[in-house]
């Protein structure tokens, strides 16, 4: 079921699967059901995710908003180029302390995220899905096409997904890959 509400610029996909409906988390507020049960349970990571960077006040403010109620919440981090979105994303990953997938669409971003994660969260093992590699770790960086091709086997691995260049999500391959991953928290990053 695809819906579009022109007044709110609202676009979503709701699909039916056996005894339940799959609804994007950004659509919960539009539903008129009495109760929504999100009974997914994800283990905390055992990795030592210590962020060594120092955020600027505006970056810290953004991170604090994602953790307003003590746990990470889904949302979009939108900021201009050069603002430090990747750097800030590293702190969000570190603070959340759950298995995380960072989704990117190019090999260049794939390498950049791996390098930044290694700098800002030293000692953490970083998994790679893409560029001929398939290795799931506490933090994994994946290229959309590779994640799309392995979406069935990856669907239950991650509690949080950070989507770099989130404005690409409406494309069918990107939205299929993202929606097939059963993460509790999805954070988009976009300029």
Segments the model singles out, each with a brief description of its role:
Residues 144-191:
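SF2 helicase catalytic motif II
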């Amino acid at each position: 079921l695809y819906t579009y509400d022109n007044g709110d610029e609202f676009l979503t996909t709701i699909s039916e699967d056996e005894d339940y409906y799959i609804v994007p988390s950004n659509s919960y507020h539009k539903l008129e059901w009495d109760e929504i049960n999100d009974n997914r349970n994800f283990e905390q990571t055992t990795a030592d995710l210590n962020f060594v960077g120092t955020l600027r006040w505006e970056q810290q403010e953004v991170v604090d908003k994602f953790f307003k109620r003590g746990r990470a919440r889904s949302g979009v981090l939108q900021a201009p180029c050069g603002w430090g979105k990747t750097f800030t994303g590293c702190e969000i990953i570190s603070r959340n302390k759950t298995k995380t997938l960072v989704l990117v669409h190019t090999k260049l971003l794939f390498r950049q995220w791996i390098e930044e994660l290694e700098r800002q969260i030293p000692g953490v093992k970083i998994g790679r899905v893409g560029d001929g590699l398939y290795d799931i770790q506490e933090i994994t960086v994946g290229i959309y096409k590779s994640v799309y091709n392995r979406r069935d086997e990856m669907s239950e691995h991650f509690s949080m997904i950070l989507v770099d260049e989130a404005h690409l999500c409406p494309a069918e391959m990107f939205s299929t890959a993202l929606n097939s991953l059963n993460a509790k928290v999805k954070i988009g990053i976009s300029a």
